[in-house]
Amino acid sequence: MNTQAHHVITDEHLINEALSRSVAEILPSKDGLKKELQSGRRLTFYLGIDPTANYVHLGHSTNYLILERFHALGHRIIVLIGDFTAMIGDPSDKTSMRVQLTREQVLENLQTFKAQIGKILDFNDIDNPIEFQFNSEWLSKLTFEDSVELASNFTVQQMLERDAFKKRVAAEKPLFVHEFFYP
């Protein structure tokens, strides 16, 4: 996509507001991002979500507000939908396996997500539309051979370093192989 095709706003006041309201930290640096935003180049920002429930947690709304500020400045916004990974379920901070969702359940949840985040993100901007990408577009194409090749780069010990997994092993609670595949 041509990064110069859209009008990008470089107003210092608006950029400062985007970089300071509801923002705790910017990595690698606030000054570096500010310089990029003032350059006039169209940047790409994305946020990934796994629709594992039929609602958006209120705490996530801040992320969408920040994305909308960058969108209003003319930058490209991608909402990366973890439709494939939602079927696995993020094992972080879980003391037991998440209930596995069907593809249909994930897609139903996604419709609710879109309706809720559509109240924050401007989906009606035809000059700079919000883009949706789905991780199933590439993950569902992986063959078993691809999965084995990827898995050969990691050890069980590395996987067990994750806090949630350590706790479940220590508590002698089941840990299922598919949970290791959650990125």
Regions found by a protein language model. Give the residues of each.
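A glycine- and small-aliphatic-rich helix-loop capping segment at beta-alpha/alpha-beta transitions
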Residues: 63, 96-98, 150
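Short, conserved acidic/polar surface loops in the N-terminal third of protein domains
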Residues: 88-93, 143-145
